[in-house]
Amino acid sequence: LRQQLSISVSLGRRVHIMRWDKGLAAFQTEDILAKYPDVSDGTHPLIRKAAGLWGRRALARWLTETTNPTDMIVGEVPIIGNRFSEFIQAQPDQVEPALASEETTFIYPVPTKSLRANLEAIRRSTFANPKHPDEARDAPPSTMELAWRLTCAKAAELGLISEADSHSPYEEMIYVRFFEHLLQHRNAIRIGVDTIYSNAGSAHDLGANVLELNASPDEVRCVIAEVEAAFTVEEATRDVENWYRV
């Protein structure tokens, strides 16, 4: 992601970014968390739902307000577990044509087995000893493990892999099949990754020339209220549990 940003800036593009962790953080206020505390698999479903709704609307607003052809927007969209998975779902709103357009590309990296193991080790290290303020808010290593278990379970449920494979350790084939399903409504490119650039610094160091989209307190209040009016907690939970059905 950082390399993409760096290259884009060097080519004269004005880059904006929307990241799940930063977008979600705006919704994790003391008052909201008191009402909707974390659950066993992470952030409360209603908060995830609200953050995703804000994300699509923020993108729609950016597209409307941005007229300079040198501007571009990059999204960090984890998807697994309903983390900005709204961006891959075909929805009847004003931003869907742009998301489905050939001008929008969803890039998903596929690490090799050995690289995946190294990434897990790096996450354990940065989580235990954060060297950047945002690393302290990174998901714990157990979230990476949960994401893989979810990938296998949902891939098996969809018939993409066998039941026996659903208990497999990380396997590139499973990862690719699942993401091909998730991104079937999007212009998607797979990139195989087998190298870690050890001197690349923190993944959160984006550079001074990158502008980040964040939800304002008023936006947070409005979106939370809208989701509360439209869904009970049980309904929001069921909706979030179906994040992989696109």
Predicted regions and their residues:
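A conserved mid-domain beta-alpha-beta active-site/ligand-binding segment of alpha/beta enzyme cores
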Residues: 127-202
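Glycine-rich phosphate-binding P-loop
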Residues: 1-7
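A generic structural signal for well-ordered alpha-helical segments
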Residues: 8-10, 99
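C-terminal accessory extensions appended to soluble enzyme cores
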Residues: 169, 174-246
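Conserved nucleotide-sensing/catalytic segment adjacent to the nucleotide-binding pocket
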Residues: 10-86
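Noncatalytic linker/hinge segments flanking ATPase motor cores
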Residues: 57-61, 111-123, 145-155
